[in-house]
């Protein structure tokens, strides 16, 4: 069973996110630093009648990287071709996609860190000089074919920027770090979603829901759907702060946005290792989760909220973690 606080996409959420997707930067809530920079770069590219420099968007899942890619294409007034790293298995797959691009188009590659190296190497000349050299045939009859490409913009999205090779990363002229959303921005997103789907919600309820959504719009919208169910069955259909608190408590989402897995991580560190330091591998074994899952899905939010710290010796539970779970904390 999936966690309700999982920031990866679930079920019909892709369709829901397309419905909610803003079209232009002025409609995009949050990520102001990235938006402000992109606004300037896009306007400058349009004034020069050039393709926008290649863009790398990185950050945790669910923060709007795909949405931002579509917004960029809309702002430029061009078509967007969407694919993902795992789908492009060989160089020929990429060549077929590149051949379909029109001048100025946007090619969006999600999970770009998962591109095979053989495919990535084809991208280098395509990104830098808008051409590719490919080998046709095999053995003695093989020959090299030079293909010119129209100027285009590659937008790469990744949750693991550190896994990108240096040559690929260096070819992105624009980088945007997508960060967890501020409480006020997330509250506005919840209210916008409720309005689009004609849900009646109070501002206090939207604020409480945003507070417990881990700074992530995808999670906020998922929780909103579940709280709506509670409001229909246990109330009069109106989503207020009382029904929101009751629903999220029943869903094991506390006031800091932690669920049972997050709490299990913290309790394990405190009860079994006196708060740490404890190695990530050891911690993963104790909570029966993959090391990568802990590192990518759970740890970033716990660090961002100040519940754990990374040290040279391992992970350490903070005084805030002790206090939140009701343990007595003493300085080491």
From Swiss-Prot:
GO terms for cellular component: cytoplasm; Holliday junction resolvase complex. Signal peptide: none annotated. Residues 255-332 are annotated as: Head domain (RuvB-H). InterPro entries: AAA+_ATPase, AAA_lid_4, DNA_helicase_Holl-junc_RuvB, P-loop_NTPase, RuvB-like_N, RuvB_C, WH-like_DNA-bd_sf, WH_DNA-bd_sf. GO terms for molecular function: ATP binding; ATP hydrolysis activity; four-way junction DNA binding; four-way junction helicase activity. Pfam families: AAA_lid_4, RuvB_C, RuvB_N. It is found in: Cytoplasm. The keyword Mitochondrion does not apply. DNA binds at residues 291, 310, 312, 315. Residues 1-181 are annotated as: Large ATPase domain (RuvB-L). It catalyses: ATP + H2O = ADP + phosphate + H(+). It is an enzyme of class 3 (hydrolase). Its EC number is 3.6.4.-. Residues 182-252 are annotated as: Small ATPAse domain (RuvB-S). ATP binds at residues 20-21, 62, 65-67, 128-130, 171, 181, 218. GO terms for biological process: DNA recombination; DNA repair. Its main location: cytoplasm. Belongs to the RuvB family. Homohexamer. Forms an RuvA(8)-RuvB(12)-Holliday junction (HJ) complex. HJ DNA is sandwiched between 2 RuvA tetramers; dsDNA enters through RuvA and exits via RuvB. An RuvB hexamer assembles on each DNA strand where it exits the tetramer. Each RuvB hexamer is contacted by two RuvA subunits (via domain III) on 2 adjacent RuvB subunits; this complex drives branch migration. In the full resolvosome a probable DNA-RuvA(4)-RuvB(12)-RuvC(2) complex forms which resolves the HJ. The RuvA-RuvB-RuvC complex processes Holliday junction (HJ) DNA during genetic recombination and DNA repair, while the RuvA-RuvB complex plays an important role in the rescue of blocked DNA replication forks via replication fork reversal (RFR). RuvA specifically binds to HJ cruciform DNA, conferring on it an open structure. The RuvB hexamer acts as an ATP-dependent pump, pulling dsDNA into and through the RuvAB complex. RuvB forms 2 homohexamers on either side of HJ DNA bound by 1 or 2 RuvA tetramers; 4 subunits per hexamer contact DNA at a time. PANTHER family: HOLLIDAY JUNCTION BRANCH MIGRATION COMPLEX SUBUNIT RUVB, PTHR42848. Has 3 domains, the large (RuvB-L) and small ATPase (RuvB-S) domains and the C-terminal head (RuvB-H) domain. The head domain binds DNA, while the ATPase domains jointly bind ATP, ADP or are empty depending on the state of the subunit in the translocation cycle. During a single DNA translocation step the structure of each domain remains the same, but their relative positions change. This is Holliday junction branch migration complex subunit RuvB. It comes from Streptococcus pneumoniae serotype 2 (strain D39 / NCTC 7466). The lineage of its organism: Bacteria, Bacillati, Bacillota, Bacilli, Lactobacillales.
């Amino acid at each position: 069973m999936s966690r309700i606080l999982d920031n990866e996409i679930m079920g019909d959420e892709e369709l829901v996110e397309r419905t909610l997707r803003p079209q232009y930067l002025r409609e995009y809530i949050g990520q102001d630093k990235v938006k402000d920079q992109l606004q300037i770069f896009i306007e400058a590219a349009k004034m020069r009648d050039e393709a926008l420099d290649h863009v790398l968007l990185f950050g945790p899942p669910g923060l709007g990287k795909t949405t931002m890619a579509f917004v960029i294409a809309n702002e430029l007034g061009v078509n967007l071709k969407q694919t993902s790293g795992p789908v492009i298995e060989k160089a020929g797959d990429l060549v077929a996609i590149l051949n379909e691009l029109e001048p100025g188009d946007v090619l969006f590659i999600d999970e770009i860190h998962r591109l095979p190296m053989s495919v990535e190497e084809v991208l280098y000349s395509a990104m830098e000089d808008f051409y590719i050299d490919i080998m046709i045939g095999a053995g003695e009859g093989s020959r090299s074919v030079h293909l010119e490409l129209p100027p285009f913009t590659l937008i790469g999205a990744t949750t693991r920027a550190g896994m990108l090779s240096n040559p690929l990363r260096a070819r992105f002229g624009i980088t945007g770090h997508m960060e967890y959303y501020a409480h006020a921005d997330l509250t506005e997103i919840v209210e916008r979603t409720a309005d689009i789907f004609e849900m009646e919600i109070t501002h206090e309820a939207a604020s409480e829901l945003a507070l417990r959504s881990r700074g992530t719009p995808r999670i906020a919208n998922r929780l909103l759907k579940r709280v709506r169910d509670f409001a229909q069955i246990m109330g009069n259909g109106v989503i207020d702060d009382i029904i929101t608190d009751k629903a999220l408590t029943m869903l094991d989402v506390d006031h800091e946005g932690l669920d049972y897995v997050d709490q299990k991580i913290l309790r394990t560190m405190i009860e079994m290792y006196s708060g740490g330091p404890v190695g990530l591998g050891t911690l993963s074994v104790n909570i029966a989760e993959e090391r990568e899952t802990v590192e990518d899905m759970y740890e970033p939010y716990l660090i961002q909220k100040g519940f754990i710290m990374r040290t040279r010796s391992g992970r350490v539970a903070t005084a805030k973690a002790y206090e939140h779970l009701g343990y007595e904390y003493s300085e080491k």
